[in-house]
Amino acid sequence: MSRSLKKGPFVAYHLLKKINKMNADGKKDVITTWSRSSTILPNMIGFTIAVYNGKQHVPVFISDQLVGHKLGEFVSTRTFKSHIKADKKTKR
């Protein structure tokens, strides 16, 4: 279900404030955030945002193709450990 157009996209205030300050200063430092639900806006292009996956911060470089998506879409929270099949030689 999409968000109402009159409300606009959700971006955490602290993240938006950091982006606007760094745009004004001309810096491109890595920004750490826990806000996986924030929408990527056009003024975030060119930044590297380290998004928390529950264990560590994973860096995501923001390009123009990512605009409109959520930050959490690009950082998986679950690691898949494959199901190890029993070796047939050891069964004999």
From Swiss-Prot:
Does the keyword field hold rRNA-binding?
A: yes
What InterPro entries does the record tag this protein with? Ribosomal_uS19, Ribosomal_uS19_bac-type, Ribosomal_uS19_CS, Ribosomal_uS19_SF
Does the keyword Phosphoprotein feature in the UniProt annotation?
Answer: no
| GO cellular component terms, semicolon-separated | chloroplast; mitochondrial small ribosomal subunit
- Principal location: plastid
Identify a single GO molecular function assigned to this protein. structural constituent of ribosome
Origin, by domain of life? Eukaryota
What SUPFAM superfamilies does the database record attribute to this sequence?
Ribosomal protein S19
Q: Where in the cell is it found?
A: Plastid, Chloroplast
Q: Which PROSITE patterns would you find in this protein's record?
A: RIBOSOMAL_S19
The record's keywords, sorted A to Z, are: Chloroplast, Plastid, Ribonucleoprotein, Ribosomal protein, RNA-binding, rRNA-binding
Q: Which Pfam families match?
A: Ribosomal_S19
Enumerate the Gene Ontology biological process terms: ribosomal small subunit assembly; translation
Family recorded in the similarity comment: Belongs to the universal ribosomal protein uS19 family.
* Chain's role: Protein S19 forms a complex with S13 that binds strongly to the 16S ribosomal RNA.
Q: What is this protein called?
A: Small ribosomal subunit protein uS19c
Origin organism is Thalassiosira pseudonana
